[in-house]
């Protein structure tokens, strides 16, 4: 009996470590590099998606992407969740003055554009990821992101 409990506990630990959801992210959210992410299949325009993300968790916004690795992580999540892998990111050009910015106020240090209107969608194909600019009024899926809770931050 003790051996069964030990083996069961070991399998549970392995399952939880491979599930992609860290203890510091809420259920249903995936963890990457200190942030929590969730892809939503609901179709919303950019403003409604941003508002929805803001209501999900303190500090949650449409996702900002800062590296190829982060982009690949979000792309993999999207391809598992969405039928059509086109989703809003937090990157927009709110005043239409060619001053692009992330909705979470992080620095624009990584970008992979293909075209140029006012809000940005990430499209995941089988072997490639593209960013397209699309009119903010279009309705597509979206991905939200927030900084993961840290035990150290609570002290």
From Swiss-Prot:
Cystine residue pairs: 25-36, 53-144, 119-136
Where are the coiled-coil regions? none
* Secreted recorded as keyword: yes
What InterPro entries does the database record attribute to this sequence?
C-type_lectin-like, C-type_lectin-like/link_sf, C-type_lectin/snaclec_domain, C-type_lectin_CS, CTDL_fold
* Cross-referenced PROSITE patterns: C_TYPE_LECTIN_1, C_TYPE_LECTIN_2
Q: Which UniProt keywords apply?
A: Disulfide bond, Hemostasis impairing toxin, Secreted, Signal, Toxin
Q: Which residues form the C-type lectin domain?
A: 32-145
Q: Where in the cell is it found?
A: Secreted
**Secretion signal: which residues?**
1-23
Q: Which SMART domains match?
A: CLECT
Q: Which GO terms describe its cellular component?
A: extracellular region
Q: Which residues cross the membrane?
A: none
Molecular functions (GO terms): toxin activity
Principal subcellular localisation of the protein = secreted
- State its role: Interferes with one step of hemostasis (modulation of platelet aggregation, or coagulation cascade, for example).
Question: What further note is attached to this protein's record?
Answer: Shows greater sequence similarity to the beta than alpha subunits compared to other heterodimer snaclecs.
Oligomer status and interactors? Heterodimer; disulfide-linked.
Regarding protein family, the annotation reads: Belongs to the snaclec family.
Entry protein name? Snaclec clone 2100755
The species this protein belongs to is: Deinagkistrodon acutus (Hundred-pace snake)
